[in-house]
Structures are given as C-alpha cells and as structure tokens.
C-alpha cells in the first residue's frame, strides 16, 4: 500500500480529521495573507480560527481513535473466534481422517485373517489329499 492509498484509506476511516486539517491550513494561509497586507484584526481572527480548527481536528482524531480501537478489539475477538473455529474444524477433520484410516486398517486385518483361514483350509485339504495318495500307494 503506497502513501496515497494509505492517506485515502485513513481519510475514509476518519473523514473529519482531513477536514479539520484543511480548515486549519486555510486559516493559517489566510492569516499569513492578512498579516502581509497589514490587517491585524483579520490576522488575529484567522489565528483564533486556526486554534479552533486544530482543537476540532484533535477531538475528531481522539474520538475516531477511541471508536476504531473499540472496533479493532471486536475485530480481533472475531478473528480469534474464527481461528478457534478453524482449529476445531481441522481437529475434527483430523479425527475423521484417523477414524477412516483405522477402519481401513481393521478391514485389511479382517481380510488378512480371512485369507489366512482360507489358506489354512486349502493347505489342510492339500495335506489330506497328499496323505490319501500316500495311503493309496502303500495299499498297492
């Protein structure tokens, strides 16, 4: 964000501060002009305006600062709440992922057990067939 963008952003946040600054500047310029022309009464009046405009600017700055401080505290709280929600969501997703992986592992173990039982059954049948062949050979 460059300087002009910052000025525009801050002016939108606190529109009375730039107004007070412009009025103060105008009062100083008019006071200098009337001083150069020798109009003492006008010079005094413009300097009094300057003081009033500066006071207005300061009050606007302080009130705006207090307002935005309160607002930024609310935004910070909202941001923290969002971060907490995001953390809870991530935690929930992680738990779901762990449960999914656990189910996959259980399913694999179950398939392994079934395969093991089937292999044992096939092996047992093979051994029995082998014994029968040997017994037939011995009988002959």
UniProtKB/Swiss-Prot annotation:
Keywords: Coiled coil, Membrane, Mitochondrion, Transmembrane, Transmembrane helix. The gene is RCF1. GO terms for cellular component: mitochondrial inner membrane; respiratory chain complex. Residues 68-126 form a coiled coil. It comes from Clavispora lusitaniae (strain ATCC 42720). It is a multi-pass membrane protein. Residues 1-79 form the HIG1 domain. Cytochrome c oxidase subunit which plays a role in assembly of respiratory supercomplexes. This is Respiratory supercomplex factor 1, mitochondrial.
């Amino acid at each position: 964000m460059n300087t002009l963008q910052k000025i525009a952003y801050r002016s939108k946040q606190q529109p009375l501060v730039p107004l007070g600054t412009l009025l103060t500047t105008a009062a100083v310029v008019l006071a200098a002009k009337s001083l150069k022309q020798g109009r003492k009464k006008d010079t005094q009046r413009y300097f009094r305006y300057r003081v009033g405009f500066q006071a207005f600017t300061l009050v606007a700055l302080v009130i705006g600062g207090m307002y935005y401080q309160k607002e930024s505290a609310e935004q910070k709280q909202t941001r923290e709440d969002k971060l907490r929600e995001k953390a809870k969501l991530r935690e929930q997703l992680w738990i779901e992922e762990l449960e999914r992986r656990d189910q996959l592992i259980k399913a694999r173990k179950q398939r392994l057990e079934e395969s093991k039982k089937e292999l044992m059954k096939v092996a047992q049948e093979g051994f029995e067939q082998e014994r029968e062949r040997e017994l037939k050979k011995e009988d002959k």
